[in-house]
Each structure stands twice: as structure tokens, then as C-alpha cells.
């Protein structure tokens, strides 16, 4: 997994490439936590994400919950068909804000 960070003022976009699995989900969680306090909104661009495991889904839900408690918008964008199917099958497409 590769995480590419891009700031536009106080809006952080994280472009995730590769796979989010049990091991890499911990890296993603650490990266989000390391950047917290530096952004007013978070966009996660998943256009180059190949796969996400249940551990990765947990990171997304935990991130949404934490950011919501601070009224910080969290949006997931550019979900491909493979990852979109995982979101639909798990019901996460109804929980997460996906554009």
C-alpha cells in the first residue's frame, strides 16, 4: 500500500494505492492519526485501491466516527467496481459517505 498526501489549504486528500489488509490497515490508521489536527476535512481517494479487508473497513469506520465527533467532514471518492462491491456487500456503502 502507498499513501499519497496532498493538502489544499486545510483539506487533506489521501490517495491510497494497492491493498488495505490486516497489516497495511495499521499503517493507514497511524498515518491518519499523525495528520489529525492538521486538516479541516479529509478526502480519501480510492481510485487506485485494489482491495480492502475487514481490517481496512474498520479503519474507515473508526476514522469516520472520530472525525464526526469533531465535525470534520470525511468523504471517500473514486471507488472502483471491485472495492465498491466490497462496500455494497458489507453494507458500508450505506454507512460511509462515498462520492
Residue ranges and their predicted role:
Residues 97-99:
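Short acidic-hydrophobic, aromatic-tinged amphipathic segments that line or gate anion-handling sites
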Residues 22-95:
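Amphipathic alpha-helical interaction surfaces in cytosolic regulatory modules
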Residues 1-15:
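Short beta-strand/loop segment at the start of cytosolic alpha/beta domains
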Amino acid at each position: 500500500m502507498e499513501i499519497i498526501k496532498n493538502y489544499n489549504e486545510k483539506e487533506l486528500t489521501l490517495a491510497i494505492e494497492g491493498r488495505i489488509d490486516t497489516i497495511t490497515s495499521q499503517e493507514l490508521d497511524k498515518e491518519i492519526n499523525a495528520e489529525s489536527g492538521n486538516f479541516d476535512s479529509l478526502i480519501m481517494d480510492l481510485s487506485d485501491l485494489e482491495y480492502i479487508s475487514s481490517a481496512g473497513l474498520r479503519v474507515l469506520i473508526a476514522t469516520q466516527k472520530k472525525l464526526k465527533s469533531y465535525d470534520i467532514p470525511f468523504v471517500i471518492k473514486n471507488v472502483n467496481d471491485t472495492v465498491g462491491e466490497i462496500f455494497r456487500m458489507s453494507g458500508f456503502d450505506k454507512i460511509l459517505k462515498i462520492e
